[in-house]
């Protein structure tokens, strides 16, 4: 699964709107929609924010793993 498909899947699992996630990332809703559609690449720092927020690993978000490993606590 591609990362853009994964971030949409996770957002929907959490019953969040694109606007809420866009606010979390400090971007506009249209920009976030472009991330989900694959039209625009999402910055790595935004992927880190999402991984922490959803408590999943970057491997899961990027599709390198299908296991929802928790983001390591520090």
Predicted segment positions?
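Short basic helix-loop element that most often maps to the first helix and adjoining turn
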Residues: 5-24, 49
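Short, charged recognition helix plus adjacent turn
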Residues: 34, 62-74
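Recognition helix of helix-turn-helix/homeodomain-like DNA-binding domains
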Residues: 26-41
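Short, Lys/Arg-enriched, disordered terminal segments
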Residues: 1-5, 74
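Short amphipathic helical patch at the helix-1/turn junction of helix-turn-helix
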Residues: 1, 12-13, 41, 52
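DNA major-groove recognition helix of helix-turn-helix
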Residues: 25, 36, 54, 65
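DNA major-groove recognition helix of helix-turn-helix/homeodomain DNA-binding modules
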Residues: 26, 45-60
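Conserved hydrophobic/aromatic packing and binding residues within compact polymer-binding modules
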Residues: 7, 21-22, 32-35, 61
């Amino acid at each position: 699964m591609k990362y853009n498909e994964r971030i949409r899947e996770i957002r929907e699992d959490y019953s969040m709107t694109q606007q809420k996630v866009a606010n979390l990332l400090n971007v506009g809703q249209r920009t976030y929609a472009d991330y989900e559609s694959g039209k625009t690449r999402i910055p790595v720092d935004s992927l880190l924010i999402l991984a922490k927020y959803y408590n999943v690993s970057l491997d899961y978000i990027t599709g390198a793993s299908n296991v929802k490993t928790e983001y390591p606590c520090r």
